[in-house]
Amino acid sequence: MSTESKCPFNHTAAGGTSNKDWWPNQLNLNILHRHSALSDPMDKDFDYAQAFKKLDLAAVKRDLQALMTTSQDWWPADFGHYGGLFVRMAWHSAGTYRTADGRGGAGGGQQRFAPLNSWPDNANLDKARRLLWPIKQKYGRNISWADLLILTGNVALESMGFKTFGYAGGRADTWEPDDVYWGSEKIWLELSGGPNSRYSGDRELENPLAAVQMGLIYVNPEGPDGNPDPVAAARDIRDTFARMAMNDEETVALIAGGHTFGKTHGAGPATDVGPEPEAAGIEQQGLGWKSAYASGKGHDAITSGLEVTWTSTPTKWSHDFFKHLFSYEWELTKSPAGAHQWVAKGADEVIPDAFDASKKHRPTMLTTDLSLRFDPAYEKISRRFYENPAEFADAFARAWFKLTHRDMGPRARYLGPEVPAEELLWQDPIPVVDHPLIDDADVAALKAKVLASGLSVAQLVSTAWASASTFRGSDKRGGANGARIRLAPQKDWEVNQPAALAAVLETLEGVRKAFNDAQTGGKKVSLADLIVLAGAAGIEQAAKNAGVAVTVPFAPGRMDASQEQTDVDAMAVLEPVADGFRNYLKSAYKTPAEALLVDKAQLLTLNGPELTVLVGGLRVLGANVGDAKHGVFTDRPGTLSNDFFVNLLDMGTEWKPVSAANDVFEGRDRATGLVKWTGTRVDLIFGSHSQLRALAEVYGSADANEKFVRDFVAAWDKVMNLDRFDLA
């Protein structure tokens, strides 16, 4: 008999066989319940924005300046300056951002958590964050890790003689990992072409991914799958940087500007490097990549396996990157770790050693650096920057600011004394309120005008939903403020039914103009406000039809953006490929429609009950795209009833698929065989999925109609105001 002590607890944090193990295709609702108050250690009344406003930013920057040149024996600074390390840390914090779904980025300080803290591309950034801990400890809750990581990158640049474009705080920390799809691969840095490859066809990268391999931020610096071909690498660079909202000029500026500083590390073989932080022993205290190669640090450090220093002044802003790029011819070589890199042919040794002042080296470059010379489009930009240093400096400053602030959303979220005054197109600018706002009496009068305009409840509700539901909690873009639903590209999106939308907007514009023309004190209502107000009027009427008196909350203050304030290409990524709330799929996808619904709900920051009540309410209000009848489980559309749930849960109905793709279903009366309803996967999932069915049963109960209406109104109001950072 074994004498090994057996733990009496089998259901501990150490894990066990999970539901996901048993049913790997089960719909995952966990993403709707991340970052709740249960994981947040701060007091309930803690307001990070107010805490940051009390911060002495200048004092923090002085401490960071001192840190830059205070080398620590446990992780010595290259060239006696941590600037290059901290630039990389900030870049990699922000650089996970991707435009397709707005996820990733610096907000929340996710670099502290798995998987990002253990990505191969983030090797030894754990040391950078530990170097920062005394400063974070000193200022505590007044500066988040998320803000500190980016501020440190800015100070690093400034300490090396570069003038940055500005800095904004306002990134509140999160306290657990995001649940983000980073790819299907099961092996770090797995090459393309495998069974879980993110590439298909002619090297077409899977959406929404924005990196070429699992565990990389953007591209493989050795070239595609390690092939040292600068021209082929340029294609990867262009694709991945575009997916992070950067054009060619911004891309060249970022690569050249970032690689003006510091060095890469590849002193020895990767086999000497220990496990990443999440796999390291508990005694490592959250650090990883412990190296057995010589001292394992400083001159002996191994990070990427590459051993490259780009400029002769790696701790000072200079023009050396382009000077070296164009002044030399380059020959392929290998680092001490065996990685492909390039060395200047026949060049003098002008590059300082990071730890031995008596040594010099020839200039070296990465394959992806040479892309800036050998790709024709990049070469033109690089030559222009080479010949115009001031233009290059300005381009890098602006691109760095964009990189580090892209996921913050509108300027209303920016905090601190270093926020640049210039308004930038990628910030989706909206005019500031310049007139008196409507009051409660005006709201009541406008609701009456809207209801008397001839527009139906379905038209009012679907238009307001279309306007507000573009919001993404990931990068804080979209939403009803700005009324961009009336502008390109949103007015032409298929999901918005352009012809029908134009008619609704024309009617609402007539109501708006009549109201504004009648005012004598300069009071106005914006179309952005009126669209939301009209939706509220429609819901109140629909609730009244159900016998429930309710007032939908409304806060004026939205403004109307202009077409000139709207970047059409940047706005295009907000177009829904699916909106289960409106029973819409743009085309067939490998991902099930119900998973796309949950993804949309997560971007709208909704939880399970909010998702459930909104779908049920929008169905009976007739908000489906194209007036489709799928999921309209009621004989009284336009009435805010709980009929969707009552009829879905009715055991007198038997459901069967009627499409080859199993995406459309008929519900027939079990007794007569007659078709009662039709529905899609996003309808039937509320009866099929055990958690969603439990929620549906709450709203389908005999005593639930009033609760359903009030919960629907609360969830609706939340969506309508997701972008109202001015109300915070």
Swiss-Prot record:
Catalytic reaction list: H2O2 + AH2 = A + 2 H2O; 2 H2O2 = O2 + 2 H2O
Cofactors demanded by this protein: heme b
Protein keywords: Heme, Hydrogen peroxide, Iron, Metal-binding, Oxidoreductase, Peroxidase
Cofactor binding description: Binds 1 heme b (iron(II)-protoporphyrin IX) group per dimer.
Residues at the catalytic site: H92 (proton acceptor)
Positions of crosslink type Tryptophyl-tyrosyl-methioninium (Tyr-Met) (with W-91): Y218-M244
Annotated crosslink Tryptophyl-tyrosyl-methioninium (Trp-Tyr) (with M-244) location: W91-Y218
Site (Transition state stabilizer): R88
GO terms for cellular component: cytosol
Subunit-level organization: Homodimer or homotetramer.
Protein family: Belongs to the peroxidase family. Peroxidase/catalase subfamily.
PANTHER family listed in its UniProt record: CATALASE-PEROXIDASE (PTHR30555:SF0), HYDROPEROXIDASE I, BIFUNCTIONAL CATALASE-PEROXIDASE (PTHR30555)
Function: Bifunctional enzyme with both catalase and broad-spectrum peroxidase activity.
Name of the protein this chain belongs to: Catalase-peroxidase 1
Organism: Burkholderia ambifaria (strain MC40-6)
